[in-house]
Amino acid sequence: AKILFDILTDQKKDVRLIGNIGNPALSEKKISKKTFFVIEVSSYQLEYSKIFSAKYAVILNISVDHIERHKNLTNYVNAKFKLLASQNNKSFAFVKKNDRLINQKIRKNKFKSKIYKVDTLNMNKLSNQLNNKYFISDGNKENLSFILKIASNLKLNNTKLINSINNFRGLKYRQQIIFDSKNLTIINDSKSTGFASSENILKNLNDIYW
């Protein structure tokens, strides 16, 4: 959400970052039909939502992290897919291509939006111009593939897009690059809740002091 917000800001769009990160949605003022809202919304919020509808919806993955809250996997998947169920035929959805549960849900339902299946193998030619170490991990690389697909759909300026991505340093304390040189990169991942949340970046690095 944060990198998409930064990209749209650099493109001189009127953009607001709200939801789980950023400001409360109802606190935003002076909005227009051209205002972009980048919303990080949880499955908990989606579960109870009856009127929320996004023109651009993103489902990065389906994990078992929130099963305790939703009681079972079916309830969790249904909550996530309210994003797509609330869309119309002028909306767009971006989902992980090789996720079994996501593909299964799409096959069983007739969603109205245009659905893009995204993976790192089909990143566009712009990816060759990127040199940001933040995206070295599999997880962040996957996030980047979604960003590039969304940017293409929005027809953003490619030069500004590349600059925004190359300058992105991540959220504070979450795989945040705080120093980078030829021989040393220092990454602050102190907000990690455990080994599992750091595993993606660790397995893509060498000579690690953790």
Describe every region a protein language model picked out.
Residues 1-3, 24, 41, 194-198:
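Short glycine/serine/threonine-rich phosphate/pyrophosphate-binding segments
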Residues 25, 31-131, 135:
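Flexible active-site lid/hinge loop adjacent to a nucleotide/diphosphate
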Residues 14, 133-210:
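Nucleotide phosphate-binding/pyrophosphate-handling subdomain across enzymes
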Residues 11-12, 84-89, 205-209:
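Short, surface-exposed connector motifs at secondary-structure boundaries
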Residues 1-16:
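A conserved segment at the C-terminal end of the G1
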Residues 13-25:
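Short beta-strand-centered segment that lines the nucleotide-binding/catalytic pocket of NTP-utilizing
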